[in-house]
Amino acid sequence: MPVYAALDVSKASTQVHVVDETGTCLWRGKSLTHPEALAETLAPFANDLVKVGLETCCLSTWLGHELRGRGLPVVCMDARQAHAALSVTMNKTDANDARGLAHLLRAGLYREVRLKGWDDVRLWTLIHARRALLRAQIDVANALRGALRTQG
């Protein structure tokens, strides 16, 4: 029987909601936001999982690649579209968001987003760090120049 799992990711913990093809809740709960813990949480459903969905966020590249490496069929969903669909819910909680994401995943009402490759992420990180260092260097030089300007 096809099973769909949705992850509502936050920094410390992730809300997990698992549904079958009819939308019946098979399991819901929390797990640590770590690929090992999430894979362990989803292990009882691993043979039947059709898709594991998570919204785009700062952790989605890491979690997506790590969970795919553990053999899970991860799909990264566009957060703006998912937010628009989930904004009609009355009680907005992480658990309800995970439930809504699971139903969007099951119905196919989501836009898939490509996860960036590790090489792209590393290059972007280096460029961003270089830009921050240059900005700090310029700020220090300007501060010294301003302090010395009063001395002539």
Task: Name these PLM-found stretches.
Residues 1-152:
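Phosphate- and other anionic-substrate recognition elements at nucleic-acid/protein interfaces
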